[in-house]
Design a protein with these regions (language model features):
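Short, polar loop motifs at secondary-structure junctions
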Residues: 125-128
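Conserved phosphate-binding loops in nucleotide/dinucleotide-binding enzymes
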Residues: 150-161
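P-loop NTPase catalytic core of nucleic-acid-dependent motor ATPases
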Residues: 1-77, 140-144, 168-171
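A short helix-turn-beta junction within AAA+ P-loop NTPase domains corresponding to the substrate/partner-engaging
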Residues: 130-149
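Short secondary-structure boundary/capping segments
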Residues: 48, 92-93, 135-138, 156-157
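Conserved nucleotide-sensing/catalytic segment adjacent to the nucleotide-binding pocket
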Residues: 54, 66-119
Length: 171
Protein backbone atom coordinates (compact mmCIF):
# COMPACT_ATOMS: atom_id res chain seq x y z
CA UNK A 1 0.00 0.00 0.00
CA UNK A 2 1.73 3.23 -1.13
CA UNK A 3 0.04 5.30 1.60
CA UNK A 4 1.33 2.97 4.33
CA UNK A 5 4.85 3.11 2.88
CA UNK A 6 4.66 6.91 2.68
CA UNK A 7 3.60 7.18 6.32
CA UNK A 8 6.23 4.65 7.45
CA UNK A 9 8.95 6.59 5.62
CA UNK A 10 7.89 9.92 7.13
CA UNK A 11 7.96 8.38 10.61
CA UNK A 12 11.34 6.74 9.90
CA UNK A 13 12.75 10.12 8.87
CA UNK A 14 11.12 12.04 11.74
CA UNK A 15 12.07 9.68 14.58
CA UNK A 16 15.83 10.48 14.60
CA UNK A 17 15.11 14.20 14.31
CA UNK A 18 12.71 14.07 17.24
CA UNK A 19 14.98 11.75 19.24
CA UNK A 20 18.55 12.83 18.43
CA UNK A 21 21.02 9.98 18.50
CA UNK A 22 18.48 7.17 18.10
CA UNK A 23 19.69 4.34 15.90
CA UNK A 24 17.03 2.93 13.62
CA UNK A 25 17.36 -0.80 13.04
CA UNK A 26 16.38 -0.55 9.39
CA UNK A 27 17.72 1.18 6.31
CA UNK A 28 15.74 2.49 3.38
CA UNK A 29 16.59 1.12 -0.04
CA UNK A 30 15.11 3.34 -2.74
CA UNK A 31 15.01 1.63 -6.10
CA UNK A 32 13.74 3.00 -9.37
CA UNK A 33 14.60 4.68 -12.64
CA UNK A 34 16.80 7.74 -12.91
CA UNK A 35 15.08 11.09 -12.60
CA UNK A 36 12.52 10.18 -9.95
CA UNK A 37 13.76 12.65 -7.33
CA UNK A 38 15.56 10.27 -4.97
CA UNK A 39 18.65 12.48 -4.68
CA UNK A 40 16.59 15.67 -4.56
CA UNK A 41 14.35 14.52 -1.72
CA UNK A 42 16.97 12.81 0.42
CA UNK A 43 19.45 15.60 -0.36
CA UNK A 44 17.02 17.93 1.41
CA UNK A 45 16.94 15.57 4.39
CA UNK A 46 20.75 15.43 4.41
CA UNK A 47 20.86 19.26 4.35
CA UNK A 48 18.85 19.31 7.58
CA UNK A 49 21.60 17.28 9.25
CA UNK A 50 24.27 19.67 7.90
CA UNK A 51 27.75 18.33 8.77
CA UNK A 52 26.17 15.31 10.49
CA UNK A 53 24.79 14.07 7.18
CA UNK A 54 26.93 12.45 4.53
CA UNK A 55 26.88 10.85 1.13
CA UNK A 56 29.11 7.99 0.06
CA UNK A 57 29.67 5.76 -2.91
CA UNK A 58 30.75 2.19 -3.63
CA UNK A 59 34.48 2.95 -3.25
CA UNK A 60 33.98 4.49 0.18
CA UNK A 61 31.80 1.59 1.30
CA UNK A 62 34.44 -0.97 0.33
CA UNK A 63 37.41 1.02 1.68
CA UNK A 64 39.18 -0.11 4.84
CA UNK A 65 39.30 3.59 5.78
CA UNK A 66 35.81 4.57 6.88
CA UNK A 67 36.43 7.91 8.59
CA UNK A 68 33.79 9.44 6.31
CA UNK A 69 31.17 7.84 8.57
CA UNK A 70 32.56 9.26 11.81
CA UNK A 71 30.01 11.35 13.72
CA UNK A 72 27.31 11.03 11.07
CA UNK A 73 23.63 10.82 11.96
CA UNK A 74 22.33 10.35 8.41
CA UNK A 75 24.01 8.72 5.44
CA UNK A 76 23.12 8.34 1.80
CA UNK A 77 24.68 5.52 -0.19
CA UNK A 78 24.42 6.45 -3.84
CA UNK A 79 24.40 3.40 -6.12
CA UNK A 80 26.23 1.26 -3.55
CA UNK A 81 23.84 -1.66 -3.67
CA UNK A 82 23.38 -2.09 -7.38
CA UNK A 83 26.07 -4.59 -8.33
CA UNK A 84 25.52 -8.32 -8.20
CA UNK A 85 29.02 -8.86 -6.78
CA UNK A 86 28.14 -6.70 -3.76
CA UNK A 87 26.99 -9.84 -1.96
CA UNK A 88 30.28 -9.94 -0.04
CA UNK A 89 29.53 -6.46 1.38
CA UNK A 90 26.22 -7.48 2.94
CA UNK A 91 27.78 -8.27 6.33
CA UNK A 92 29.42 -4.86 6.48
CA UNK A 93 26.18 -3.16 5.49
CA UNK A 94 24.20 -5.11 8.10
CA UNK A 95 26.61 -3.90 10.78
CA UNK A 96 26.32 -0.31 9.54
CA UNK A 97 22.55 -0.54 9.82
CA UNK A 98 22.08 -2.34 13.14
CA UNK A 99 25.17 -2.09 15.34
CA UNK A 100 25.19 0.61 18.01
CA UNK A 101 29.00 0.74 17.95
CA UNK A 102 31.33 0.46 14.98
CA UNK A 103 35.05 0.66 14.36
CA UNK A 104 36.25 3.85 12.69
CA UNK A 105 39.52 3.51 10.84
CA UNK A 106 40.94 6.77 9.52
CA UNK A 107 44.08 6.78 7.44
CA UNK A 108 47.29 7.16 9.50
CA UNK A 109 45.36 7.02 12.78
CA UNK A 110 44.69 4.09 15.10
CA UNK A 111 41.29 2.48 14.71
CA UNK A 112 38.78 3.31 17.43
CA UNK A 113 35.28 2.30 18.42
CA UNK A 114 32.58 4.94 18.07
CA UNK A 115 28.87 5.08 18.80
CA UNK A 116 26.92 4.45 15.60
CA UNK A 117 23.99 6.83 15.26
CA UNK A 118 24.02 6.88 11.46
CA UNK A 119 20.72 6.00 9.82
CA UNK A 120 21.15 4.95 6.21
CA UNK A 121 19.37 5.36 2.89
CA UNK A 122 20.65 3.54 -0.18
CA UNK A 123 19.77 4.33 -3.81
CA UNK A 124 19.76 2.10 -6.84
CA UNK A 125 18.66 2.75 -10.40
CA UNK A 126 19.53 -0.71 -11.63
CA UNK A 127 17.50 -3.88 -11.62
CA UNK A 128 20.36 -6.07 -10.30
CA UNK A 129 19.79 -4.77 -6.81
CA UNK A 130 21.72 -6.15 -3.86
CA UNK A 131 21.11 -9.70 -2.80
CA UNK A 132 18.76 -9.50 0.16
CA UNK A 133 17.45 -12.47 2.04
CA UNK A 134 13.65 -12.72 1.70
CA UNK A 135 13.22 -12.43 5.49
CA UNK A 136 15.79 -9.63 6.00
CA UNK A 137 14.11 -7.07 8.28
CA UNK A 138 16.98 -4.60 8.01
CA UNK A 139 15.78 -3.03 4.76
CA UNK A 140 12.62 -1.33 3.65
CA UNK A 141 12.77 -1.56 -0.14
CA UNK A 142 10.75 1.18 -1.78
CA UNK A 143 10.17 1.13 -5.51
CA UNK A 144 9.82 4.62 -6.91
CA UNK A 145 7.24 5.47 -9.54
CA UNK A 146 8.19 6.54 -13.03
CA UNK A 147 9.56 10.10 -13.30
CA UNK A 148 7.01 12.89 -12.98
CA UNK A 149 6.77 15.95 -15.19
CA UNK A 150 10.18 17.71 -15.19
CA UNK A 151 8.54 20.95 -14.02
CA UNK A 152 7.80 19.29 -10.66
CA UNK A 153 11.50 18.66 -10.05
CA UNK A 154 12.46 22.17 -11.17
CA UNK A 155 9.91 23.62 -8.76
CA UNK A 156 11.20 21.41 -5.92
CA UNK A 157 14.82 22.40 -6.59
CA UNK A 158 13.84 26.08 -6.67
CA UNK A 159 12.04 25.69 -3.34
CA UNK A 160 15.05 23.92 -1.81
CA UNK A 161 17.38 26.66 -3.04
CA UNK A 162 15.11 29.20 -1.33
CA UNK A 163 15.33 27.68 2.16
CA UNK A 164 13.16 24.65 1.54
CA UNK A 165 15.29 22.25 3.60
CA UNK A 166 14.84 24.43 6.70
CA UNK A 167 11.10 24.63 6.02
CA UNK A 168 10.99 20.85 5.60
CA UNK A 169 12.70 20.47 8.97
CA UNK A 170 9.96 22.46 10.69
CA UNK A 171 7.13 20.76 8.78
Amino acid sequence: NPREIYEWLLKWLACPMQNPGIKMQTAVLMHGPEGTGKNTFFGAIRAIYERYGGIFDQVQLESQFNGIFSGKLFGIGNEVVSRAELYHQQGRMRNMITETEWPINEKNLPARMEQNHCNMVFFSNRIDIAKLDPDDRRYCVIWTPEPADPSLYLEAKSELADGGAAALHWH
